[in-house]
Swiss-Prot record:
This is Large ribosomal subunit protein uL2cz. The gene is rpl2-A. GO terms for molecular function: RNA binding; rRNA binding; structural constituent of ribosome; transferase activity. It is found in: Plastid, Chloroplast. GO terms for cellular component: chloroplast; mitochondrial large ribosomal subunit. Part of the 50S ribosomal subunit. GO terms for biological process: mitochondrial translation. SMART domains: Ribosomal_L2, Ribosomal_L2_C. Residues 1-22, 224-274 are annotated as: Disordered. The lineage of its organism: Eukaryota, Viridiplantae, Streptophyta, Embryophyta, Tracheophyta.
Length: 274
């Protein structure tokens, strides 16, 4: 991804750093309307995820995370922008006439061929079971449950590493630093997700942030006591507590939020790094 800087003519262009224009011309049979209800609210209308709301209307692209076109070669026809994720997507034309979207692997260009199945070449964009991959392979779009489709390492620039195979399980190091076990029969895609430089973008202005459905973030210390535990006081005052808290009074900054006694606790060999 190429980062473009504009000539300074307004405060927006002075601070902005955007990626190169990747156009989107989605196929009608691969999109559907998505009713984005809630905007961070639960069924009772109470805010459970803050700083969300507004945003431009979106059409959802149907992404093939299963890669179940076995041993049928496909060709990359387009590389497109997807408003629902920070990774790009590419349209694949398969030999049997099927047309599907997949996540764009880093380095893939229009005209490249891909295939999924067992005993296929270890090549960027190919999907195959973990049992057929050599140790040290960089992978993304990894299944957790066999046949359910890829669920891990799908964000822009995400990549995991196959570090061991023993018995019925394979050991993976995930982008978060977590090391966990997954069935060797689960599938994954070779390579890294594209659009690696997405974290170098600078939107440059608040309006661009609003288009993405992200609202302003207000510090609790400048609120009233009725709105936040940190609020209140005369002028610029400290939070008045030994430790910071969430708007609902629970401990913040460091408290573990993972549920106890989860089924996958035995599969995690090392917790993610902060």
């Amino acid at each position: 991804m190429a980062i473009h800087l504009y000539k300074t003519s307004t405060p927006s262009t002075r601070n902005g750093a955007v990626d190169s224009q990747v156009k989107s011309n989605p196929r009608n049979h691969l999109i559907y309307g998505q009713h984005r209800c809630g905007k961070g609210r639960n069924a009772r209308g109470i805010i459970t995820a803050g700083h969300r709301g507004g945003g431009h209307k979106r059409l959802y692209r149907k992404i093939d995370f299963r890669r179940n076109e076995k041993n049928i070669y496909g060709r990359i026809v387009t590389i497109e922008y997807d408003p629902n994720r920070n990774a790009y997507i590419c349209l694949i034309h398969y030999g049997d006439g099927e047309k599907k979207y997949i996540l764009h692997p880093r380095g893939a260009i229009i005209g490249d061929t891909i295939v999924s199945g067992t005993e296929v070449p270890i090549k960027m964009g190919n999907a195959l079971p973990l049992t057929d991959m050599p140790l040290g392979t960089a992978i993304h779009n990894i299944e957790i449950t066999l046949g359910k489709g890829g669920q891990l390492a799908r964000a822009a620039g995400a990549v995991a590493k196959l570090i061991a195979k023993e018995g019925k399980s394979a050991t993976l190091k995930l982008p978060s630093g977590e090391v966990r076990l997954i069935s060797k029969n689960c599938s994954a895609t070779v390579g890294q997700v594209g659009n690696v430089g997405v974290n170098q973008k600078n939107l440059g202005r608040a309006g661009s942030k609003c288009w993405l459905g992200k609202r302003p973030v207000v510090r609790g210390v400048v609120m009233n006591p009725v709105d936040h535990p940190h609020g209140g006081g005369e002028g610029r005052a400290p939070i008045g507590r030994k430790k910071p808290a969430t708007p609902w009074g629970f401990p913040a900054l460091g408290r573990r939020s993972r549920k106890r006694k989860k089924y996958s606790d035995n599969l995690i060999l090392r917790r993610r790094t902060k």
